Every structure is written in structure tokens, then in C-alpha cells.
A protein has these predicted regions:
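N-terminal "arm"/small-domain region of PLP-dependent enzymes with the aminotransferase-like
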Residues: 4, 9-10, 14-65, 193
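Conserved N-terminal alpha-helix of the aminotransferase class I/II PLP-enzyme fold
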Residues: 64-101
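Conserved PLP-anchoring active-site segment centered on the Schiff-base-forming lysine
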Residues: 108-127
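Active-site-proximal loop->helix
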Residues: 111, 128-137
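Short, structured coil segments at secondary-structure junctions
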Residues: 115, 135-137, 191, 222
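Active-site phosphate-binding strand-loop segment of PLP-dependent enzymes
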Residues: 141, 145-197
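Active-site PLP attachment segment
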Residues: 215-242
Length: 242
């Protein structure tokens, strides 16, 4: 399994100590403004499902509306099952859903780093990754596949940054070229940096099991975070991070 960054372990322990960890609760939406969680039927005052359409029995089996933030009103059994299936497919402990692949990229990057940290973003990255880099407030260094020596220099110069994150597409959407993932993982390990790979165009296409460019390159266990989308090869909508 991919090693967990030290700062992430420390941050989680701090939240646990302060009793601030927000668990993901499975909540079944019921008609008439009610819900069921832990076997108990309750009135649901946490949802934004004002007209009850997300829990209308006429949509049973096809309804996908969340109704509110999952951290507030819980996660539906359908979403929980999907996250478990994605985690099993990706051979990871867990997966986290987003409404789109774009949101998965922007949200994940902005959550991992912030002001004072350093991002190393490939010049050909998708706009969603670029937006995530900007939103984070971290200092962004741009690199290319042809000059990884420059990336190494930039990583060395940023050794004082609390967190360092290399961000790249696995397959670049404009030309179909694969990122040099093995070399990027070598640099990430050498300079104690996290690495995030966007598998939007790799999932279902590359790798023995269709898990993408990281699987094809044999670096799944070396990549810290992988982001995927359900709107391309999977033929649906949504995004996820593992």
C-alpha cells in the first residue's frame, strides 16, 4: 500500500484528540421527510431536499440526489456501495466520491496543500488541476516531462516548504502522451514529496485490470493519491479520489 504522509497522520491524530473527526454515516432517505440511520427512523432536519424529490419512491432504484452535504445529512447506501466498489476496483482501502471529475481534482489538490506549501504542476495538466493549484494558495512551480532535471532542482530549492506535492495527468488529454510516472515517483521519494496523478483518461484504458496509467507503469503503490472520473470510459458522471 502507498505510505501515508507523516503530516496527514499527525493531522488526523490531532483531530481525533480534539474529538473533531467527522465520520461518514450511511443514511437511507425515506418519504415524508424522514431518514433511517443505525436502524432508527428519524425526522430529517439536516437535508436541503425541500420538495422531497430525492426520496420520492417513484425514483426508487434510480434516485441519485444527495439532498445536502454528506457530512451533515449522511451518505446514502447507494453512494456507500459505489465507494466500496471503487475502492475494491482500485485495490485501495477506501474511495471518496465527488460530483464530477473536475471537482475531484480541484477539491483534492486544495485540501492537501495551502499557503507556505509548494506544488509542482506539469505544464500540460488539465484545467481542473490548474484551478486546484490556484485555489490552494500554495506556491506553484511548473515543469515539463523533457526537463525533469529542472523539476529536481525546484524540489530541492523548496525543501523548506512544510508540504510538497507533484501534480500530473497520467495521460495528457490533448495529445495522449503518458506522463513519466516512474521518474516522477523517483523524484517524489528522493525529495519527500507527495504525488497526485489524474487518471481521467487512463481508467478503463491502461493497465492489466484497467486501473489506469499508474497500474500500467507499475507505480500504484508509490503514488500518494489517484483521482479518477466516471464520465469517460465508465460512461456515467462523477469523480473520485483514492
Amino acid at each position: 500500500m502507498t505510505p501515508e504522509p507523516d503530516w496527514l497522520t499527525d493531522a488526523l491524530r490531532s483531530l481525533e484528540t480534539d474529538d473533531l473527526v467527522r465520520p461518514h454515516r450511511e443514511v437511507e432517505l425515506l418519504p415524508s421527510g424522514r431518514c433511517r440511520t443505525d436502524g432508527e427512523v428519524l425526522l430529517d432536519f439536516s437535508s436541503n431536499d425541500y420538495l422531497g424529490l430525492a426520496r420520492d419512491l417513484r425514483q426508487e432504484g434510480v434516485a441519485a440526489g444527495a439532498g445536502a452535504s454528506p457530512l451533515i445529512s449522511g451518505r446514502s447506501p447507494e453512494y456507500c456501495r459505489l465507494e466500496k466498489r471503487l475502492a475494491a476496483f482500485e485495490n485501495t482501502d477506501a474511495a471518496l466520491l465527488f460530483p464530477t471529475g473536475f471537482a475531484a481534482n480541484t477539491g483534492t489538490v486544495a485540501a492537501l496543500v495551502g499557503p507556505g506549501d509548494a506544488i509542482f504542476s506539469h505544464a500540460d495538466n488539465h484545467a481542473s488541476l490548474i484551478d486546484g493549484c490556484r485555489l490552494s494558495g500554495a506556491r506553484v512551480h511548473v515543469f515539463t516531462s523533457h526537463r525533469l532535471d529542472q523539476l529536481a532542482s525546484k524540489l530541492g530549492e523548496a525543501s523548506g516548504a512544510p508540504r510538497r506535492l507533484i501534480v500530473t495527468d497520467g495521460v495528457f488529454s490533448m495529445d495522449g502522451v503518458l506522463a513519466p510516472l516512474e521518474s516522477l515517483c523517483d523524484l517524489a521519494e528522493k525529495f519527500n514529496s507527495m504525488i497526485l496523478v489524474d487518471e481521467a483518461h487512463g481508467t478503463g484504458v491502461h493497465g492489466t485490470n484497467g486501473r489506469g496509467s499508474c497500474e500500467a507503469a507499475g507505480v500504484e503503490d508509490r503514488v500518494t493519491f489517484r483521482v479518477g472520473t466516471l464520465s469517460k470510459a465508465v460512461g456515467s458522471t462523477g469523480g473520485f479520489v483514492v
